[in-house]
């Protein structure tokens, strides 16, 4: 018997939607604008709870910490979460030993997980190739928040500093069970010399390997790594011809920055045994060694034993979990909102089953009477699904419906990992996290949808959820080369220039169309057309020039507006200086977290 709350799919959206009075903070409003028409108090409360600026986030977290210190048990970790944190230590320790990033700060943070009053701040992402800035900015945001809260707590309680102000841990969860398709194997750099205005660094995968989990994907071959280096050095050389940064000092600055970064790449490559670890180790090298952060890294695929009790809870309460997701998806669809969450998510179990081929399967939950040693065992819970890659039929018995005793077996647990929405549910329930930073893309939508499930399952959401959607504005070698191509000096001039070209193209079209009609009329009537052909030729030639400029300017726009990978920051700022500028923006500004960050490269230019 298939277990599910309902066989009815989410309702289709109507043609129109309404808008209510949901008003999240001004700077963040655009991020959540499509949710404004959702008349749901849970969603409204969640969105309005997200701080607009960093100082507000610090004050709110300080309030949480002070109240926690003043009370005894309510906010402290209970026995379950403390036991789970102890389990977590083993897997964190394993990662940092293998990555060679077991610094003193990391070691001290691991030890803090033994203290029930320790608060955990969490950020999450896949181990992308040369991860883009947004991934690192999550870590910087939480580290800066941690530092500021600890500093203010120290000022308030000098006499109890060791008891109260140094008990925050930053945890970065590596979602290493994602497939090898899409962004996880792609890194971008701005380059108008390429067709789309960007250079793509890409891990080649075959059809047979694109459905592998990143954790099971072998490390790239030396040939691939060398090719990435060759692509980057070629990009550096071609972009260094710009008049704005072709001086010997700039070329030396760029080259030195790149070589320092590539040393970290080579070190991570030498330690890694999988594609996921190569990218994860590089992130940890940057964060823990170069930046000196005490952020803890851990692999999602290894920590299922930490979530054992949570898996049991979600599976035992699957009808509530499923119904919450179904209702949430139906509600958003009625308002014309596509959250990116699969419409069939509510039908699937909250876990993936891992396949021997290295891929995984979405599974459904079945209840079945089974006999064992001629003694009937009532109501066994079975997970069943088909591997996305090899199409094998996977089955796992979790044991008696009321006890799910096989979830206590680590061999069973290591064959599963949580799906997207359950990840945050489990982090909150089983580890008692206090703060979570979301991305601005799919993770934010998943969190909004998940807020409904939190309520239905009586799980407390993080006390504070943050988003840092700001864009970095700077004039690096790729951006300057792009602007120089269209003889512009400011990135803000690109869109007005593009619109002016489109307007000219439309004007030419307006002049050409009647001439074409007149030419056709004259041909039909046998009248001379030489003059019209001459005029048409001149106009079309001018229009072709405009359209060539439009094509070039579109590449320029892509180059200056894209979110490049960490290589662009390493080259233009140096890895260490990158986080300094991000932190400075947070600490020096009371502007919205959505406000752009004006960053200064080390290049000697007119900018």
Where are these regions (language model features)?
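N-terminal targeting/trafficking signals and adjacent low-complexity tails
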Residues: 2-607
